[in-house]
Amino acid sequence: MEAKELVQRYRNGETLFTGLKLPGINLEAADLIGIVLNEADLRGANLLFCYLNRANLGQANLVAANLSGASLNQADLAGADLRSANFHGAMLQGAILRDSDMTLATLQDTNLIGADLRGADLSGATLTGACLRGANMRQEKKGYYTNLQAAILGRADLQGANMKGVDLSRADLSYANLKEANLRDVDLRKADLSYANLKGALLTDANLSGAKLNGADLQNANLMRAKISEAEMTAVNCQGAIMTHVNLNRTNLTGSNLSFTRMNSADLSRANLTKANLQEAELIEAFFARANLTEANFINANLVRADLMSANMVGADFQGATMPDGQVRHH
């Protein structure tokens, strides 16, 4: 079928085009709101600036299709093959992208507010500047998760997004807005979160081993039981964060703000806390074996039963701190 015929039939009131084979079709700027093209073959199609709001494209083949600037608000793309598709600047607000394959897709500056991305594969996709506020990527069951491995999400807006159990290993989230996002059980190994906004984010049981968090804002975040070993966390702001039972083994926390944190039973062995601010921090039973605490600020911190035995404490300030033996340091 030619593009002209399809558009004409749609204008005449026909909307059902299930399973049509239309590879390479040129439908640039066509108005096809609510069209049903589920299971259609649209490989390499030109859908630039197309109006596809509420369209049904479930299970459709859109490999390498051009959907730049297209309007797909509330469209159904569940199970669609979107590998290497170009969605640059597209509107996908409230769209259903469940179980879709978006490997290596371009989603730069895309509006994905409230989109359903559960079980979607976005590995290697580019989402720079995309807005994913309130998007749902929550892991439903074991082995069924959204894959964002090595995805590029620099400066993306993910505020309040539900990303529980998502695979973000090696992803670029530098300067991303993850304020109050649900990142519970998330795999962020070797991810780049430099200068990311993680204020109030939920990161319980998350794996951030080897991640870059330099300059990130983690104020009031919940990092309970998170694995952050061998990570880069220089100049991080963790003020007021919950970090009980966190693993920070061999992590570089030089110059970080850890004041008013709750770090009871934290593993800080071999961590570098040079010039870190731990004022008023709760560090009951924290483990500091071979940690570098040079010039760290522990003023009024609670270090009851903490292990400081082999730590380097040259120039550290423990004024007003409650020491491991329960005694308050007065000088």
From Swiss-Prot:
Gene3D superfamilies membership: E3 ubiquitin-protein ligase SopA
Bridged cysteine pairs (disulfide): none
Keywords: Repeat
Pfam families from the UniProt entry: Pentapeptide
Pentapeptide repeat domain location: 20-59, 60-99, 100-139, 151-190, 191-230, 231-270, 271-310
UniProt keyword Repeat, yes or no: yes
PANTHER family linked to this entry: THYLAKOID LUMENAL 17.4 KDA PROTEIN, CHLOROPLASTIC
The protein, known as: Uncharacterized protein slr1819
Organism encoding this protein: Synechocystis sp. (strain ATCC 27184 / PCC 6803 / Kazusa)
